Amino acid sequence: MALYVQKYGGTSVGTTDRIEHVADKVKSFCDNGHDVVVVVSAMSGETNRLLSLASAITDQPNPREMDVLVSTGEQVTIALLCMALQKRGCSARSYTGDQVRIVTDSAHTKARIKHIDVEAIQNDLKTGRVVVVAGFQGVDELGNTTTLGRGGSDTTAVALAAALKADECQIYTDVDGVYTTDPRVVDSARRLDKITFEEMLEMASQGSKVLQIRSVEFAGKYNVPLRVLSSFVDGPGTLITLEEEQPMEQPVISGIAFNRDEAKLTVLGVPDIPGVASRILGPVSAANIEVDMIVQNVADDNSTDFTFTVHRNDFERVKKVLNEVGNDLGAREVRGDANIAKVSIVGVGMRSHAGVASKMFDTLAAENINIQMISTSEIKVAVVIAERYLELAVRALHSAFELDAREQNR
């Protein structure tokens, strides 16, 4: 039979009743003859509780000690789930990231997986045992506990699935799959039966929060079939896999992603000379701030306006950096706007269809929505607009590309 790696997030294991429900679900797979490795997150709210304890002690906690602290959340969950499985007659054993030898680099709070020793897991599976692994954590070459960053349990699950050559990695969440857009914004949004790694990666990077970006990258790199399912409602979910032969009537657009957590900054009137972009963005990068979209407008007077977006949480820090940079460059002004949003259309069908961007722009214009910035890739068009128009834009685009009227055939 098949080998499944299943991941259950914090909401799915948020109470002991929900842990019991997960145990029932896992047991049903075992009863059907499948091998199961389960990866779990900390119970909902537990990681935040642990972080608040650290904050009560110091506002500058040591990263190594933070990893030791927050990794305890998953340790509670793996033990409770094993107890629930054993109560149901299932042989089960729990492993921390250290015990299962998920070896990472030493970048505390944001470590990356280097390799996994799966021998112990394989030996357990041969005896019919369910293996329950703590997500989000690992150990470096020196024996220090490390964590993979927020959402790292998804990455743990995919990495284990790749190392074990599992038939499928199943991510159980509080939604029943990947939708054409957020159903809370468009109530006629539809669940997709299938989506490519490439599309899912674009949607995740553009604001869709169903899957963590690193896990999608990992799955695509090692060709691990991913399936997003609900912990609470039975259904087929959404399969994320390599691009294969598509139906003749393949949709141009698979989904609409959006992100409210953006802020825009502009340095006005800097000299249009070689290296100016580096002089602006270098200090931003040195402050460990990620830049998203970039636009440079050159004027006739040999000056340029340089605009880019960052995460809204970094807005004030970036303004401070840019004010210093602007003074050094002789900039006319530094402007900022935290009341923006990004809306993106995503679909591999763009490769073979012309006029997709034009249709997007026409749709927004018809709603009197001004486009402030544009970014494109082979399968994505993203725009920045005023945040107050976000939901109107998403609904209009969802309708224009017939995502809420089409029978799903993917």
Task: List the predicted regions and their residue ranges.
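Nucleotide/pyrophosphate-binding catalytic subdomain
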Residues: 1-216, 309, 384-386, 401, ...
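Conserved dinucleotide-binding and phosphotransfer motif residues
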Residues: 32, 88, 222, 287, ...
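Glycine-rich beta-alpha junction loops
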Residues: 43, 175-177, 222-226, 230-235, ...
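A conserved regulatory-domain signal marking ACT and ACT-like small-molecule sensing domains
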Residues: 57, 237-410
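Conserved beta-strand segments of alpha/beta enzyme cores
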Residues: 91-93, 225, 290, 370
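Short hydrophobic alpha-helical runs that function as membrane-insertion/retention elements
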Residues: 168-172, 226-228, 292, 373
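Acidic-aromatic/histidine active-site loop/patch
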Residues: 219
